[in-house]
């Protein structure tokens, strides 16, 4: 009966059944070396989801949290995992699954950074890397393993990733993982875990396939919904530039380059082909840009992200696949060369620019065909996208 509520909630939203909040990290009874790591990482106070979800996870409940990127969800489960593992035991105690390699690596970085003062090992188990390296790393018994479903499933099947000591199983962006066709592997992984494993599931949307996972594999879960209005479109100035024809976007972008000094920017296009085309065109006009999309191999993508993070490349042109995996603190400007094909991706793209109160600017190139989509986005996020003012340079 408990899950009845899940079925009839409007627009794929879950209904919260838990509303206790703890509004400072100090009050969460965390290990002192973990608390030190949290503050050293730069967190000052918990975000909305952290205030609600960390405690029930630490207390051992199964938890479903509905939240988008940019809400601090990665740190929510990273902190909870680090609090719960026994650093003296050299075996995998927490398994975290993510839909893309980039996101898995980003999660690994957060776990390692927050766990900096604890004696923990966290291994990223992802496709596109050497299987032999994975086997070796897993034999050392890292307490936390984060990975993509395909490779994790493979390592469990080959008995290199042992599941008998696992206490926690975290599924991040569950909607994305299931929509990418990982359902079978995820179900298999569930079957191979100890019965007592605690399950934490995070998802921006709650379609039927995600709800099925929650009913099949979770016990009386705590449900937490972080509403859209708590997301980080706050502090992000959103503008549009009306572009009469698609062909004129390139000149518009060049003009924009002349007007503003860009510290770091991400430009989103809707297709891989367009990313390559735009990169060539801008390079031909002597702009320094780097590009990234799903056709590239892992080593290339890693190198490009590294250059972008370090600031040696300033402008990154990317597709939506990477909107969820790019977390660069200095991004001051996001340009939607193409408006996203679905409104949910809008927040994944621009919610980066001003994460956790950092200010950012988003500029949308809008042709006559895009006006309807822009209105939909405004309505969906209860936000206003204004025409770009002349003095935009002062805002970035």
Curated annotation (Swiss-Prot):
Xref: CDD domains: DEADc_EIF4AII_EIF4AI_DDX2, SF2_C_DEAD
A GO term, aspect molecular function: RNA helicase activity
Catalytic activity: ATP + H2O = ADP + phosphate + H(+)
A GO BP annotation: cytoplasmic translational initiation
Self-association state and partner proteins as the record states: Component of the eIF4F complex, which composition varies with external and internal environmental conditions. It is composed of at least eIF4A, eIF4E and eIF4G.
Function in brief: ATP-dependent RNA helicase which is a subunit of the eIF4F complex involved in cap recognition and is required for mRNA binding to ribosome. In the current model of translation initiation, eIF4A unwinds RNA secondary structures in the 5'-UTR of mRNAs which is necessary to allow efficient binding of the small ribosomal subunit, and subsequent scanning for the initiator codon.
Official protein name in the record: ATP-dependent RNA helicase eIF4A
Gene assigned in the entry: TIF1
